[in-house]
C-alpha cells in the first residue's frame, strides 16, 4: 500500500511540474519464444535503438493478445512497481483507424520495419531496424527513472490452462527529461 501511495504521489508531483518532453532510452532486453509460432525471434538493443528479427513458419491467426506491463523502479533497478498494464488484441491495434498510444507506437515501428497491417499474418521473415521511441510518443506522465516493459504475447485466456504463450519480451530503459 505504501508503494502505491509513493507512486501516486510521485506521478502527481510530476504532473504538477509540467509536461516537458521526455526521452526514452533503451538499455537492454531479452526474449523467449514458442517454436510453434517462431523459427527464430531475436531482440537486440544497440546505441539506444531496437532491432528485431523474426521468422514465422506458419500463419499467425487472429486472436493473438499482448499484455503490455510498464513498471518503474523506485530503488535503482532492484525491484519494480507496476504503473499500468493493458491486454491488447494485436489485430485490433494493427488494423484500427483510431489513434491510441499503442497504435502510435506500432505506426512508428512500421516506419522502421516490415510489419503487416492486417491479420492473419502469413509465414515470413519480419524485422525492425534502428527503432527508437521518439519523445513525442513517450507518455507525458512517465517521470524520469528506470523502467521495465514486459510484453507477453499469447492466445487463449491468460493464466489458465487454455493460455498458449507465443512470445515474452523484457525491455529495460531509462526515461529522462529532454
What role is predicted for each listed range?
Residues 128-136:
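Short edge beta-strand/strand-turn motifs with a hydrophobic/aromatic core
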Residues 2-115, 121-125, 137-178:
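N-terminal onset of structured domains
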Amino acid at each position: 500500500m505504501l508503494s502505491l501511495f509513493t507512486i501516486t504521489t510521485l506521478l502527481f508531483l510530476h504532473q504538477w511540474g509540467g509536461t516537458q518532453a521526455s526521452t526514452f532510452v533503451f538499455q537492454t532486453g531479452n526474449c523467449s519464444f514458442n517454436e510453434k509460432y517462431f523459427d527464430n525471434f531475436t531482440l537486440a538493443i544497440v546505441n539506444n535503438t531496437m532491432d528485431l528479427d523474426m521468422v514465422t513458419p506458419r500463419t499467425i491467426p487472429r486472436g493473438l493478445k499482448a499484455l503490455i506491463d510498464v513498471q518503474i523502479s523506485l530503488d535503482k533497478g532492484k525491484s519494480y512497481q507496476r504503473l499500468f498494464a493493458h491486454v491488447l488484441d494485436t489485430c485490433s491495434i494493427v488494423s484500427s483507424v483510431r489513434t491510441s498510444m499503442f497504435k502510435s507506437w506500432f505506426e512508428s515501428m512500421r516506419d522502421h520495419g516490415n510489419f503487416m497491417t492486417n491479420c492473419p499474418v502469413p509465414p515470413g521473415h519480419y524485422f525492425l531496424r534502428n527503432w527508437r521511441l521518439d519523445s513525442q510518443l513517450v507518455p507525458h506522465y512517465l517521470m524520469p527513472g528506470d523502467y521495465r516493459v514486459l510484453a507477453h504475447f499469447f492466445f487463449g485466456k491468460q493464466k489458465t490452462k487454455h493460455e498458449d504463450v507465443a512470445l515474452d519480451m523484457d525491455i529495460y530503459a531509462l526515461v529522462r527529461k529532454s
